[in-house]
Design a protein with these regions (language model features):
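Short, solvent-exposed loop/helix junctions and linker helices
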Residues: 31, 156, 292, 330-334
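Glycine-rich S-adenosyl-L-methionine
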Residues: 319-344
């Protein structure tokens, strides 16, 4: 069997199992809602396993477990410092995804524990360089929603079932020929986009389109100092550029809060370190970020024929002032092009 065939089979198996897990939630809510739970739980598993791997390295020469080290004041502070430096957050041993899976198996799990654990991850970043990349990251995963069940017991049972299924997926395995975690995310984002119909463009650029755009802006370039997407959606287009050449920093802006969270998760899931990306949550045309910066490459799949204010104040905006006329209120396409050209170095 060729590697390509092996990859294809691994992907098909992964996709089949992922969609089966998604179907556990399908009866309770629409696709856009259960997307947030599935992707959020995958992301929490990723954060947990990342922390576990870092701690395993730190304690490699010590005869002590994660749990034992955390009970010791000196060890605990050292581990916190190491985790904050290397991954930008820390997770207490009892809050790890694997620890909660054991609770589920022993029928001791409570969904409130998961909700608290998620809050603690975000709190751990306060005052750190990583704070902006983590705060509010799970805000769309409402674990108290009655859509998951009318009682805490019902919600606990449903989320516990999903977590058990996710725990069985081999995201990290020496025999895997594909980027399991990245592929899982891209598959689910794409599948949810297909279900969303026209609204899909708000958060997802089809892989074929992303690939063409990424190849165009990286043609003949061994590396990019930075790349910018003013309407970055889930971040898939930015990440595609990184597959074509070495990218040192990713910048993006996204006005939809749910999609903004998805983009930050996607960056971290694809092992982009927290200090190497900056995704901002605001309207690109009306409230632009990064006005003091220039970029080696700018890519985008903007919302075509979108409306904007075309306020007269923008006649003096350096992005538009050289053209003598603003894009019409009914179609902002030209404004997006002018915006992108302005940011090019």
């Amino acid at each position: 069997m060729s590697i390509t065939e092996k990859q294809r089979q691994q992907q098909q198996e992964l996709h089949k199992r992922l969609w089966s897990i998604a179907n556990d939630l399908r009866g309770n809510m629409d696709a856009s809602e259960f997307r947030n739970y599935i992707l959020g739980l995958i992301f929490y598993r990723f954060l947990s396993e990342k922390a576990e791997a870092e701690v395993a390295d730190a304690l490699a020469d010590e005869d002590v477990t994660y749990e034992e080290a955390w009970e010791d004041d000196e060890y605990r502070e050292d581990l916190k410092e190491e985790l904050l430096e290397n991954v930008g957050y820390y997770i207490e041993p009892q809050d790890l995804f694997s620890s909660m899976v054991k609770e589920i198996e022993n029928q001791r799990f409570d969904i409130e524990h998961l909700a608290q654990a998620i809050r603690k991850v975000e709190t751990s970043t306060l005052g750190q360089d990583s704070e902006e990349d983590f705060i509010g990251l799970f805000s769309d995963m409402d674990l108290s929603s009655t859509r998951l069940g009318n009682t805490v017991k019902d919600r606990t049972a449903l989320i516990g079932k999903v977590m058990i299924h996710l725990a069985e997926l081999p995201f990290v395995h020496s025999d895997m020929e594909i980027d399991m975690l990245g592929d899982a995310y891209e598959f689910l984002i794409g599948r949810f986009a297909a279900n969303a119909g026209k609204k899909a463009g708000e958060f997802y650029t089809p892989q074929q389109v992303s690939k063409i755009l990424a190849k165009i802006v990286t043609q003949g370039k061994d590396q990019l100092r930075n790349v910018y997407d003013p309407t970055c959606g889930s971040g898939s287009l930015l990440l595609r550029v990184g597959k074509e050449t070495k990218v040192y920093r990713y910048n993006g802006q996204e006005r939809n809060n749910t999609t903004y969270n998805l983009a930050r998760m996607n960056m971290l899931l694809h092992d982009v370190r927290y200090e190497n990306f900056d995704i901002q949550n605001a309207d690109t045309l009306e409230n632009p970020a990064f006005m003091e910066e220039k970029f080696d490459a700018v890519v985008a799949n903007p919302p075509y024929s979108a409306k904007w204010s075309a306020d007269s104040q923008f006649n003096d905006d350096e992005r538009f002032s050289n053209y003598g006329k603003l894009a019409p209120k009914s179609k902002a396409d030209y404004a997006f092009i002018q915006h992108m050209v302005h940011y090019l170095d």
